[in-house]
């Protein structure tokens, strides 16, 4: 027998005495006397910076012989990146633990706004524990006036935690530290109580099944076997950051060149990427005006660091299109210009790896004061208008932004004429776009714009065989690395477009979306829906979506009694029909045995246990 626990939320960074990272779940598993398993054997699947699995998985033994499986996910962005797996794990949980740090309102609101709605939809009345971890810093007696109740500072109050627990019907705990008392006796006592409850419920259900099978001494009804397991589709890992890094390294579609008269060489870049991360570059390239930004520090940073010089002649810069040469920009600070290649690599990598940037700058500049000055200028470039510079504490920022933070900012330029250098003509409408993003994210587009094709020199490019809505969804994926189809039909159209432009990861996303939508439909909806499942299968095969076509065949076989009654079932090929008949559920053998059993029951005038 096993117990499955799902832990969600970020309780903050905690450490063992030997400076090894720990947390609420791992500390409990390592210290509880009821849980067996040494420290090294607990962790089965640690999150790495490359693969980024959704959950960290722990396995141990509890109460002697009970298998304990814990899945822990501290970051919502990673949880949301594979919602197919995440939803299934929450749906199968016996206990859910929600945790946050009382000194970090960001982690509390992440739990409240993101995790709680998912739990409400997916969980089936399983016990929930809300753990508020940490001791509040600078906590004062709360003011009761209306002006103060709107904002309690950076600490999460007890009232807010209790209110969240009431909303979910959960048990609320405050753990001031991760010591033996709070972990072993307080948190552990509550968790082990719910574990015993779950074991009792599972044992009771098992005993009921045994009583039902042993109560009938005549001919036993036929046993309905479980349907075959559906093929599992694994999502392709994102290569968004490497795509834009390669764009910087290959110097394709360059439209801006930075230089300093006293520094040899130039630094090439792309306006669209720079503007997606910085209002300084938006102001420099006239994407926004000073009136739009309304932040004197950003305006001052732009004027102090950069100046456009359209008359400059730069023989060292690559000029792929002589008719539209890159824009020359003077960098007024020579030291900043000498480190600009490292700064751009930092920006193109997501602008969160501050420690690596500081090391790169320190290798070039020996003076620590100069290094601090350069880092401070980078922070000013990335500042958000009208807000205090949130990048003061780089380590905190790095911990909260492990993924790209400007993939959503690129959406600001989607289907907008700002900085656009190519226009697609679709169904009589025009869609502006940016060659740099298209070349970086799509190999077919890169070959089209860089080869000896008409599109390489043309600004207006016609697109055939795709609707405007589908093509806009395709561009949205290229710009943001995500998409959300409106339904199965649009997902199939987007899959066809992705196959046409050979974007394999988008194909996998569409496949997972279609599979998830079909799996979530109840039998009654499957029977009444107008969607032609056989036509969907044939399209998947025609467009080389092997994973989806194989899954659809298994889906038709598993729901044989529904789809065999539909007229399109006759459109299956001989090979497909043979596969469906072989793997159908329920099987022909079971239906024959059931008919014989019914006949026997009616002949003896007994009560049928099956029906």
Curated annotation (Swiss-Prot):
- The record's top EC class is hydrolase
Protein name, per record: Rho-related BTB domain-containing protein 3
Q: Which GO terms describe its biological process?
A: male gonad development; retrograde transport, endosome to Golgi
Q: Where in the cell is it found?
A: Golgi apparatus
Q: Which UniProt keywords apply?
A: ATP-binding, Golgi apparatus, Hydrolase, Nucleotide-binding, Repeat, Transport
Q: Tell me, what does this protein do in biology? A: Rab9-regulated ATPase required for endosome to Golgi transport. Involved in transport vesicle docking at the Golgi complex, possibly by participating in release M6PRBP1/TIP47 from vesicles to permit their efficient docking and fusion at the Golgi. Specifically binds Rab9, but not other Rab proteins. Has low intrinsic ATPase activity due to autoinhibition, which is relieved by Rab9.
Question: GO molecular function of the protein, one example?
Answer: small GTPase binding
Segments carrying the region annotation (Interaction with Rab9) are 420-611
Give the enzyme's EC designation: 3.6.1.-
Where does the record place the BTB domain?
254-356, 420-487
> Which segments carry the region annotation Rho-like?
1-175
Cited InterPro entries: BTB/POZ_dom, P-loop_NTPase, SKP1/BTB/POZ_sf, Small_GTPase
Q: Say if the entry is tagged with keyword Acetylation.
A: no
Q: Can you supply one Gene Ontology CC term for this chain's record?
A: cytoplasm
Q: How does it assemble?
A: Interacts with RAB9A and RAB9B (at lower level compared to RAB9A-binding). Interacts with M6PRBP1/TIP47.
Keyword ATP-binding belongs to the record: yes
């Amino acid at each position: 027998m096993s117990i499955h626990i799902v832990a969600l939320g970020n309780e903050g960074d905690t450490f063992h005495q030997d400076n090894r990272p720990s947390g609420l779940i791992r500390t409990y598993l390592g210290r509880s006397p009821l849980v067996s398993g040494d420290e090294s054997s607990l962790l089965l699947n640690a999150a790495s910076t490359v693969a980024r699995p959704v959950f960290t998985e722990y396995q141990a033994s509890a109460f002697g012989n009970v298998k304990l499986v814990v899945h822990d996910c501290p970051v919502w962005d990673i949880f949301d990146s594979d919602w197919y797996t995440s939803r299934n794990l929450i749906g199968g949980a016996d206990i859910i633990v929600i945790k946050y740090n009382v000194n970090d309102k960001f982690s509390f609101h992440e739990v409240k706004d993101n995790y709680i709605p998912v739990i409400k939809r997916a969980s089936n009345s399983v016990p929930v524990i809300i753990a508020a971890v940490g001791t509040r810093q600078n906590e004062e007696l709360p003011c009761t006036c209306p002006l103060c109740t709107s904002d309690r500072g950076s600490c999460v109050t007890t009232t807010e935690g209790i209110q969240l627990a009431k909303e979910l019907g959960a048990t609320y705990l405050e753990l001031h530290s991760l010591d033996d008392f709070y972990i072993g006796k307080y948190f552990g006592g509550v968790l082990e109580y719910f574990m015993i409850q779950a074991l009792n419920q599972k044992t009771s259900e098992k005993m009921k099944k045994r009583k039902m099978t042993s109560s009938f001494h005549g001919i036993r009804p036929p046993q309905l076997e479980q349907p075959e397991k559906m093929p599992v589709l694994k999502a392709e890992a994102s290569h968004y950051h490497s795509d834009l890094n390669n764009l910087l390294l290959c110097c394709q579609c360059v439209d801006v060149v930075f230089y300093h008269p006293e520094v040899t060489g130039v630094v090439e870049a792309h306006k669209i990427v720079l503007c997606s991360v910085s209002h300084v570059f938006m102001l420099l390239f006239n994407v926004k005006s000073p009136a739009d930004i309304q932040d004197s520090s950003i305006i001052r940073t732009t004027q102090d660091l950069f100046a456009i010089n359209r008359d400059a002649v730069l023989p060292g810069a690559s000029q792929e299109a002589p008719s539209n040469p890159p824009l020359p920009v003077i960098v007024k600070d020579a030291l900043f210009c000498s480190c600009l290649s490292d700064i751009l690599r930092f920006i193109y990598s997501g602008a969160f790896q501050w420690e690596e940037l500081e090391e790169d700058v320190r290798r070039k500049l020996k003076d620590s004061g100069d290094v601090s000055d350069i880092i401070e200028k980078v922070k000013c470039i990335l500042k958000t208008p009208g807000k205090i510079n949130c990048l003061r504490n780089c380590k905190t920022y790095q911990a909260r932004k492990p993924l790209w933070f400007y993939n959503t900012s690129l959406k600001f330029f989607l289907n907008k004429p700002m900085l656009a250098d190519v226009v697609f003509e679709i169904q009589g409408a025009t869609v502006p776009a940016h060659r740099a993003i298209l070349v970086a994210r799509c190999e077919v587009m890169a070959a089209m714009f860089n080869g000896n094709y008409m599109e390489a020199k043309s600004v207006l490019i016609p697109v055939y065989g795709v609707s405007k809505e589908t093509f806009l969804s395709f561009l949205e994926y290229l710009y943001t690395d995500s998409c959300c189809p409106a339904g199965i039909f649009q997902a199939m159209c987007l899959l066809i477009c992705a196959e046409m432009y050979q974007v394999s990861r988008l194909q996998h996303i569409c496949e997972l979306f279609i599979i998830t939508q079909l799996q979530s439909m109840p039998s009654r909806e499957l029977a009444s829906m107008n969607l032609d499942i056989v036509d969907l299968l044939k399209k998947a095969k025609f467009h080389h979506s092997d994973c989806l076509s194989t899954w659809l065949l298994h889906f038709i076989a598993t729901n044989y009694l529904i789809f065999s009654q539909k007229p399109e079932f006759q459109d299956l090929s001989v090979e497909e029909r043979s596969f469906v008949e072989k793997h159908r559920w329920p099987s022909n053998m079971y239906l024959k045995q059931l008919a014989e059993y019914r006949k026997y029951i009616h002949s003896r005038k007994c009560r049928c246990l099956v029906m």
